[in-house]
C-alpha cells in the first residue's frame, strides 16, 4: 500500500531541491496530483485472473500482441513505454484475453526495469495458467536514454522471456516470433 503523505512530502522536497517555488500556481497542487496518480496505479495493480477450464481441448498458441504500456525506469524515474506481446500454449486452461493485458499494465505500473518486467509477466502467466509454454516480448523506448545521458531518442529496446516449449522447441519459438512480427 502506498503512503500518500510521504509521496506529497517527497515531491515537495524534490521540487524545492530543483529550485521550484512550491507555492507557485502551476506547481502548488503537483504533490497531491502525483500522490493521486500513484493511488490510481496501485488500484490497477490488482485484478482477478479469471480462468476458463471448459475450453480444455484447445492446444494451439494464443497470442495477444501490441499491448501498449507505460512504466517508470527505477534508475531515473523517467518513463519507458512501448508494447508487449504475450503468447501461451494452453494445458487445459485458458484465460480471458483481457487478463493478459491487465497483467502487463499491473506489472508496468511501478518503478521497474524492462528486463524484470518481461520476466514478471512470463512468471505470472506461467503460474496462473500452468501452460505448455509462455512467450513474452517487450519493445520499448526509454526516456532515460532519450532525454538524458546519450540523449538519443527513437531507439527500441527489445527483451524476451520464454518458458516451457517456447524455450525447448525451436518450431514453437519461431512461430511465436513470426506471428508477433505480422
UniProtKB/Swiss-Prot annotation:
Reading the lineage from the top rank, the first entry is: Bacteria
Question: What's its catalytic activity?
Answer: GTP + H2O = 7,8-dihydroneopterin 3'-triphosphate + formate + H(+)
Q: Which Gene3D superfamilies match?
A: 1.10.286.10, 3.30.1130.10
Q: Which UniProt keywords apply?
A: GTP-binding, Hydrolase, Metal-binding, Nucleotide-binding, One-carbon metabolism, Zinc
Origin species: Hydrogenobaculum sp. (strain Y04AAS1)
What quaternary structure, including any partners, is listed in this protein's UniProt entry?
Homomer.
**Can you quote a single GO CC term?**
cytoplasm
Stated name of the protein: GTP cyclohydrolase 1
Q: List the disulfide bonds.
A: none
EC number(s) reported in the record? 3.5.4.16
GO process annotations (BP): one-carbon metabolic process; tetrahydrobiopterin biosynthetic process; tetrahydrofolate biosynthetic process
What GO molecular-function term can you cite, just one?
A: GTP binding
Which family does the record claim for this protein?
Belongs to the GTP cyclohydrolase I family.
Q: In which pathway does it act?
A: Cofactor biosynthesis; 7,8-dihydroneopterin triphosphate biosynthesis; 7,8-dihydroneopterin triphosphate from GTP: step 1/1
Amino acid at each position: 500500500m502506498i503512503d500518500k503523505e510521504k509521496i506529497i512530502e517527497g515531491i515537495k522536497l524534490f521540487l524545492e531541491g530543483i529550485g521550484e517555488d512550491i507555492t507557485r500556481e502551476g506547481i502548488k497542487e503537483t504533490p497531491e496530483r502525483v500522490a493521486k496518480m500513484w493511488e490510481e496505479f496501485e488500484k490497477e495493480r490488482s485484478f482477478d485472473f479469471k480462468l476458463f477450464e471448459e475450453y480444455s481441448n484447445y492446444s494451439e498458441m494464443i497470442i495477444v500482441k501490441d499491448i501498449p504500456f507505460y512504466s517508470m525506469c527505477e534508475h531515473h524515474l523517467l518513463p519507458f513505454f512501448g508494447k508487449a506481446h504475450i503468447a501461451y500454449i494452453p494445458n487445459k486452461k485458458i484465460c480471458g484475453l483481457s487478463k493478459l493485458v491487465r497483467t502487463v499494465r499491473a506489472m508496468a505500473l511501478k518503478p521497474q526495469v524492462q528486463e524484470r518486467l518481461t520476466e514478471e509477466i512470463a512468471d505470472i502467466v506461467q503460474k496462473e495458467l500452468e501452460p505448455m509454454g509462455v512467450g513474452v516480448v517487450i519493445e520499448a523506448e526509454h526516456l532515460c536514454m532519450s532525454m538524458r545521458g546519450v540523449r538519443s531518442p527513437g531507439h527500441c529496446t527489445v527483451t524476451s522471456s520464454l518458458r516451457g516449449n517456447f524455450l525447448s522447441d525451436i518450431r514453437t519459438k519461431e512461430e511465436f516470433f513470426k506471428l508477433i512480427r505480422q
